[in-house]
UniProtKB/Swiss-Prot annotation:
Keywords: Carbohydrate metabolism, Hydrolase. The active site is at 67 (proton acceptor), 136 (for ring-opening step), 138 (proton acceptor), 143 (for ring-opening step). Its EC number is 3.5.99.6. InterPro entries: Glc/Gal-6P_isomerase (IPR006148), Glucosamine6P_isomerase (IPR004547), Glucosamine6P_isomerase_CS (IPR018321), NagB/RpiA_transferase-like (IPR037171). SUPFAM superfamilies: NagB/RpiA/CoA transferase-like (SSF100950). One of its GO terms (molecular function) is glucosamine-6-phosphate deaminase activity. This is Glucosamine-6-phosphate deaminase. One of its GO terms (cellular component) is cytoplasm. It is an enzyme of class 3 (hydrolase).
Length: 244
């Protein structure tokens, strides 16, 4: 696990974007695992800037998003499909047929989850997975005490997660209580992982992920076992780390 501590959010975003750009430039048909939320927005903006400077070509790249709210249609501004289109896909030359995001409105969620897992396998797995981390240590929507053997599945969202995500909605009551998420087993099979965190609110989760014991109560702690993880965090998120 390589840990990069930067001064601020902007620097974190630029470093992460440069790594994604390098991946796509070196392997144009890369399979990218993408995350949503506040943390990666700056990274996506930087990726768009690199693309506009004609240094990236997304035409052969394939993407798989980590998760999607259950019960939100794609046109809903809070859906992750809407988020990805608005923050990245509508601004680069990616083939829309190469975009994969779980369908939160699927009639049969079990089939949707199995099919999503099959698509990842058929693509050859994820070359580069981007992750954020929740204040409770979740990655994707894999909440505390999730099985490390989990694949894509329907999740009951933790109260902390609902509370945290309520800032995106008019009220807490509007926040979906379930989501489809790629599982821990699927994430850990990615060839390379970049974990992003910014701000003091994430410092406890970051510390437990890196310095603590591997524990299902901190889902991100399983990343300690991965052979190629880069953690990019600002000074506030790193404030509780023991880097000796």
């Amino acid at each position: 696990m390589r840990i990069i501590v930067v001064d601020n959010y902007e620097e974190m975003s630029k470093k992460a974007a440069a790594m994604v750009a390098s991946q796509v430039i070196l392997k144009p048909d890369s399979v990218l695992g993408l995350a949503t939320g506040d943390t990666p927005i700056g990274m996506y903006k930087e990726i768009i800037n690199i693309y506009k400077n004609q240094k990236m070509d997304f035409s052969k790249a394939r993407t798989f998003n980590l998760d999607e709210y259950y019960g939100l249609n794609r046109e809903n501004p809070q859906s992750y499909y809407y988020y990805m289109m608005n923050n990245l896909f509508n601004h680069v030359n990616i083939d829309k047929n190469n975009i994969n995001i779980p369908n939160g409105m699927a009639d049969n969620i079990e089939i949707e989850c199995k099919e999503y897992e099959r698509k990842i396998d058929k693509a050859g797995g994820i070359d580069l997975q981007i992750l954020g981390i929740g204040v409770n240590g979740h990655i994707g929507f894999n909440e505390p005490n999730i099985s490390f053997e989990s694949e894509t599945h329907l999740v009951n969202l933790n109260e902390k997660t609902i509370e945290s995500n309520s800032r995106f909605f008019s009220s807490k009551e509007e926040v979906p209580t379930k989501a489809i998420s790629v599982g821990i087993k699927s994430i850990i099979h990615s060839k390379k992982i970049i974990l992003l965190a910014c701000g003091s609110a994430k410092s406890d989760a970051v510390s437990k992920t890196i310095n603590g014991k591997i524990n299902p109560n901190i889902p991100a702690s399983i990343l300690q076992l991965h052979r190629d993880v880069v953690v990019i965090i600002d000074k506030e998120a790193a404030s509780k780390l023991n880097l000796k």
